[in-house]
Amino acid sequence: MVDRYIQGVIVFICSLLFVCGCDEHVDISETGDEDDIVTLLERKAMDSLFTNNAYSRSLLRKNMSQTADSLSYYRLMNVYSKACFAASQFDSVVYYSRIILHFCQKSSDSPQIHDLFSATYNMMGNVWGRWNFPDSAVVYYQKVYEHRKQGNELSYLPDICINLADGNVHKSDYTDAAYYYRRALFLCDSLGLPDRNKFPIYYGLGQTYMELRDFDLSNHYYEMAGRYFSQMSVPEKFTYLNNR
């Protein structure tokens, strides 16, 4: 029994190395733990969405054709829709998202299905945001939030609240925007997430209270955001200094 367990571990480790080191020969159907390999493939494809979009699509198409598990197939399809989004092919995002949602709607209720619902509605919200329909985007982001609460990947909840806040900013609904930014702060604390995650929240609150003409609170949150200046990326530093 122990020998068989060790063999299984060795096969799984070799599969991971195979995926990482030999991109063009990934074969998801031959791996021992498909869920872990799908997660790795999702990350691998996401890493190349903007730098090598064609590679991401090729990797995803190949493994979608090889997986025998429906959930794995539609998880990879969701990442494929993100590749379409990165290429500004928004109609394709909607097309694939509708296919995934149909699968989710006919599937048995589970945390994994709620995570997939959430990820798919998020893409729909992103598309409607890019099409400059913030009302529709917010409706989708609310669905994202409700499904994610019932899923496994709760660490995404603060980011979803930031999307809801940003959507309300674009609607000029600054009161609701402030509510969702504050909700994001609460979730960061309750989920024990790194303080670094709070920078965009503080920055968003600074902007929101500026629009509400509460300059004291605006300055307070800009100062809070500034505490993370050394940890900001170059674009974040530029945005912060340009608006401060």
Descriptions of predicted regions:
Residues 21-244:
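A "functional boundary" signal
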Residues 1-9:
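Bacterial N-terminal signal peptides that target proteins for export
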Residues 5, 18-19:
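A subset of signal/propeptide-processing and intrinsically disordered low-complexity segments
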Residues 10-17:
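Bacterial N-terminal signal peptides
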